[in-house]
Curated annotation (Swiss-Prot):
Keyword Ligase tagged: yes
EC number of the protein: 6.3.5.2
Gene Ontology cellular component annotations, sorted alphabetically: cytosol
Active site (UniProt): 85 (nucleophile), 177, 179
Protein name: GMP synthase [glutamine-hydrolyzing]
Domain spans labelled GMPS ATP-PPase: 204-396
Pathway: Purine metabolism; GMP biosynthesis; GMP from XMP (L-Gln route): step 1/1
Organism: Xanthomonas oryzae pv. oryzae (strain PXO99A)
Reactions the enzyme catalyzes: XMP + L-glutamine + ATP + H2O = GMP + L-glutamate + AMP + diphosphate + 2 H(+)
Taxonomic placement: Bacteria, Pseudomonadati, Pseudomonadota, Gammaproteobacteria, Lysobacterales
Subunit annotation: Homodimer.
Glutamine amidotransferase type-1 domain mapped to chain residues: 8-203
Length: 521
């Protein structure tokens, strides 16, 4: 079987918001890569076996004392090195060049003139055939003097060194960000570094990943049974499909129907996994327990804790009935791993980690199976399609762990959940009909616990309000509200009010993030 980890790239993270995007672009090329904090134990670099090293951007300044630096082992390794933004600046500063604060910080589109055709830039031109690239800049400092042995390969009107290289050492640097889509030929530059300069084979494909994980899972669990908390979300669904292919009936999924899921989602999950794929699924109808626990609770955090703790309690109860289960499968993905690892100094960018299954009782004593822990979300989706899951399931919008519990403002009641689930289904149905669903990042309905005066027939009505929310975003850290057509919104509003008894008004949320969050609670 092909060893898909043979050729790989190491990315040292200096805290850039785009570091994970660099890794995703490398993976899209077909090459495995890992992200390590810049202050990761340098003695492990040689043992990792990378074919090349990328130094990411970052928010620090090389002109200040104590700025993050690349370990000397990077330069002693003999490997190709590619510095991006801050990565190029520290490359210059550490190897005998100089950096300085720019008179003006540069953010956004820029034109880079290629003045020396090295292995990165040879033959690259703009649409008119000129040696010029449209790129994305995001920096305050810049390289003012290249180190000995380096050549300036690109420049702009604002900075003298937009790119540099030492071809003998195979060391390269660019001040712009090739990983973002605004840099039009950025993927070509990354491919040239990874494939042409580093010599990596493109072995990282969905089919190869599936074969690799099946072999790993079989070796890890042997003849033991595995249990999985199946939520119906993308990650757990892909884990279920992958493990079923690997170990068949040795997998048992526990699906807890909380009563807070999307419209008819419980039936859809059972139809897909139990009936169509033949996966062993235990469905626990726990709606009564959830609504009883949530009665009178309106604080969002309190609701989250109740919903999460009750899931753990129910999952524990069901696992006790499976005496042969020795392993717990989780849908942990690579960003969870990166965020949990963090940095020794705290200078690397650390985001809160989000675990698919957290706080499970210690007495369960189960080993962990995490077949997605090397994968980004987009890779998980591609695996799902390769495994035969419907595209509508694999590419659907994010849904919060507590479900409708945090889309019902205030106290959660069964009748509110049923009303909201139906309203949400109407919104999503119309988005799909209008071919808008895949053009926005997330869309959903929210139940507002306020009543509004309306007129139904000839009678006065005093009924509930439903809010619609749709956003466009790349990373969910910031988001713009989606400019949906007025006629479309009118159609959705009419359907909700006409089809759902108890709703007299529909409103559309036009708040961005920040200041608002995407979810209302």
């Amino acid at each position: 079987m092909t060893n898909i980890h043979t050729d790989k790239i190491l990315i040292l993270d200096f805290g850039a918001q785009y570091t994970q995007l660099i890794a995703r672009r490398i993976r899209e090329i077909g090459v495995y890569c890992e992200i390590w904090a810049w202050d990761h134990d340098p003695s492990e670099i040689a043992g990792f076996g990378a074919k090349g090293i990328i130094l990411s951007g970052g928010p620090e300044s090389t002109t200040l004392p104590g700025a993050p630096v690349a370990p000397q082992e990077v330069f002693d390794s003999g490997l190709p090195v590619f510095g991006i933004c801050y990565g190029m600046q520290t490359l210059a500063a550490q190897l005998g060049g100089a950096t300085e604060a720019a008179d003006q910080r540069e953010f956004g589109h820029a034109e880079v003139d290629v003045i020396a055709a090295d292995a990165l830039f040879a033959g690259l031109t703009d649409h008119a055939g000129a040696p010029r690239l449209n790129v994305w800049m995001s920096h305050g400092d810049h390289v003012s003097q290249v180190p000995p042995g380096f050549t300036i390969t690109a420049t702009t009107d604002r900075i003298p060194v937009a790119a540099m290289s030492n071809e003998d050492k195979r060391w390269y640097g660019v001040q712009f960000h090739p990983e973002v889509t605004h840099t039009l030929q950025g993927q070509t530059l990354l491919r040239r570094f990874v494939v042409d300069i580093c010599g990596c084979q493109t072995l990282w494909t969905a089919a190869n990943i599936i074969d690799d994980q099946i072999a790993r899972v079989r070796e890890q669990v042997g003849d033991d049974d595995v249990i999985l908390g199946l939520s119906g979300g993308v990650d757990s669904s892909v884990v279920a499909a992958l493990l079923h292919k690997a170990i068949g009936d040795k997998l048992t999924c526990v699906f807890v129907d909380t009563g807070l899921l999307r419209w008819q989602e419980g039936d859809q999950v059972m139809a897909m996994f139990a009936e169509h794929m033949g996966v062993k699924v235990i469905r626990v109808n726990a709606a009564d327990r959830y609504f009883a626990k949530l009665e009178g609770v309106s604080d969002p955090e309190a609701k989250r804790k109740i919903i999460g703790n009750l899931f753990v309690e129910i999952f524990d109860e069901e696992s006790n009935t499976l005496a042969n289960a020795k392993w717990l499968a989780q849908g942990t993905i690579y960003p969870d791993v990166i965020e949990s690892a963090g940095s020794k100094t705290g200078k690397a960018h650390v985001i809160k980690s989000h675990h698919n299954v957290g706080g499970l009782p210690q007495h369960m004593k189960l080993g962990l199976v995490e077949p997605l822990r090397e994968l980004f979300k987009d890779e998980v989706r591609r695996l799902g399609v390769e495994l035969g899951l419907p595209r509508t399931m694999v590419y659907r919008h994010p849904f919060p762990g507590p479900g409708l519990g945090v889309r019902i403002l205030g106290e959660v009641k069964r009748e509110y959940a049923e009303l909201l689930a139906k309203a949400d289904a109407i919104f999503i149905d119309e988005l799909r009909k209008a071919d808008l669903y895949d053009k926005i990042s997330q869309a959903f309905a929210v139940f507002l616990p306020v009543k509004s005066v309306g007129v139904v027939g000839d009678a006065r009505a005093y009924e509930w309000v439903i809010a619609l929310r749709a956003v466009e975003t790349i990373d969910f850290m910031t988001a713009h509200w989606a400019h949906l057509p007025y006629d479309f919104l009118g159609t959705v509003s009419n359907r909700i009010i006409n089809e759902l008894r108890g709703v007299s008004r529909v409103v559309y949320d036009i708040s961005g993030k920040p200041p608002a969050t995407i979810e209302w609670e």
